[in-house]
Amino acid sequence: METIILFAPLAGALMAGLTWRVISDAGAQWAATGFAFFAAILSWVVWISFSGDMQQIYVLDWVRSGTLDAALAIRLDAISAEMMVIVTTTSALAHLYAMGFMERDKAFDEGRSFRPRFFAYLSLFTFAMLILVTADNLLQLVLGLQVSGVMAYLLIAFRLHYKNANAAAIKTFVVSGIGHAGMILGVAGLYALTDSVALDDIFAALPDLDRTPLLFGLSGLELSSGLILLGALAISAQILFHVWLPDAMEAPAPAAALLSAVFVAGGAFIIWRLAPIYAEVRTVSNLMLGMGAATALIAGLVASAQTDIKRAMGFVASAQMGMIFAALGLDLGLGLYNIASVQIPLFVVVQAMLVLCVGAITRAFDDNRDMRGFGGLRQKLPTIALTMTLAALVATGFGVAQSSLAVFAPETGNLLFEFAFAAHPVTFWVLTAAAGLGVFAIWRVVFLSFNGPSRAPQDVFNAVERSPTVMVVTLAALSVLMLGSVVWEINTLSALTGLAAPAWISMSPFVATVLGFVLALWFYILQPALPKTLASSMKGLHELLRQGFYVDRVYELALTAPLKRLGGFLSDVGDGRVLDGAVAALSARLAPSYSDIVDRRFGGVLLCGAALVLFGLVAVITWTVLTGGQG
């Protein structure tokens, strides 16, 4: 059954992408969506019936070279069973939502069939994430990461006619590629240390590993785990690597939801999966804690100044994931991995729901994303307003920010803050401020969109249409899944006990949450003119936050522009003059008649020559297979 779950999205992608001319455009959409729901249903069956004993389910042989032996296999344990449910269910609902959302997408010419390709991309992304979350060895983990990165690029660049889509896709590919490079180097380091890429072998070898410093006073294990952390931070859009996610929201809403929820959670999942390793490397865990706390604070600040609703949601996702990385980076012996085990799935569901609600808003406004022109949408989109308000309540009160959960489960809701204060008091204050900012940023989006009078021209507001039924049904189903996740979280965390911390520490997240909500209410409902007045009086600070502390600009000046100039120079001088000139000169001197022969044989058509090369390659491969390469 687990193997069927893994390959069902791949089957849906192949059917949608390759047979849509036969089964029709609508048939391709239903095929991809049907296979996604089939995988989701089976995932629920596996999770409910899971006995608690880890199983390794062989799929096929993959890599065998010397001591390197890595099969494609499914590691079925509590972590993977839970993540299979979350990935497949969220993806299936995103597929269903897309059937309504892409119905009249204006990025393409009328009559041009593009939807099957989009649904194939969604299904392939789901397949890649399932490879990642079920990995039994590090090579399979890297494979899932690489394929999901490629699919992220294709999904973001899907709307070819959108001005910033291609640039956003390239940025995502480059930033995630840096993370992938770090991941590969880290995996290579662990293989060098343990002579294996199997998770069980690596975990078993940890107590006996040599801790002698190799570089910068760090051991081989610390260096390897640090490189893997680099990859996880890049994928999860943490500070310094966060620049790709706001731009990636250029993707259509169903894709943006999966990228900002499922893909971003992939980095945290890797750390969660490799928990025994990070329990051994305190230095790297401290780095994880610092990066997570800094991201939560800075991304929360930046999100609070955005006017583009989709970019605001991108920064919110980075901030929320920063809180999760902070939990992962705290002392692993304190039980915070149990917090992460419910935070990550809940984050996926809530973030997906928020972005899909935002997609419904922008679709109603003909893809206008400026929140300053919204308002009053509760009248036009009552169901969307209800579901997004519910998602905001959960996001700001039930554990994603680890804030108001203290109201419902006082003994567990403030665990993160109690442990943070005990370990690093400065981090405690950073996380408390970040929790309040996260609450403010989310409710700011809700209030600007749905409450108060409409700020759009009357004709534009009158033209707003309600979302298709299929989109509303999707959001209703996500609401049920989200509330179920909340119940699951509270039940799971109720088994944990906090520290004997002062009462003011236990109350601090609740106070931060209330303060963030009250400020958002005051600024955007009670005194709607106040934000504009403050922005005018503090233009420098407001512009600094709106521009994201100019991180993109710094990268442009320090990295992108010099590399572009270097690439242009190498292309003009190295490729254009040196290589092309040398080849032309050698061809003219050493083989004067070769071009005539090629011209006579192939008529100068490059495709004919390429076909000959392909034919020769097929012949060589066939000969190797038949003879075993033995002469």
Enumerate the predicted regions with their spans.
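Aromatic-capped, Gly/Pro-kinked transmembrane alpha-helices
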Residues: 493-504, 526-631
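Hard-cation-handling environments
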Residues: 456, 464-517
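Transmembrane helix-loop-helix hairpins at membrane boundaries of multipass inner-membrane proteins
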Residues: 1, 15-120, 193-216, 222, ...
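N-terminal signal-anchor/start-transfer transmembrane helix
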Residues: 6-21, 92, 233, 237, ...
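Membrane-entry segments of alpha-helical transmembrane domains in multi-pass membrane proteins
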Residues: 1-7, 23, 27-30, 69-86, ...
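Hydrophobic transmembrane alpha-helices and their helix-loop junctions in integral membrane proteins
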Residues: 93-141, 151-464, 482-487
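Hydrophobic alpha-helical membrane-insertion segments
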Residues: 34-49, 179-189, 388-396, 474-488, ...
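Alpha-helical transmembrane segments and their helix-start/interface "positive-inside/aromatic belt" motifs
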Residues: 25-37, 168-180, 379-388, 465-477, ...
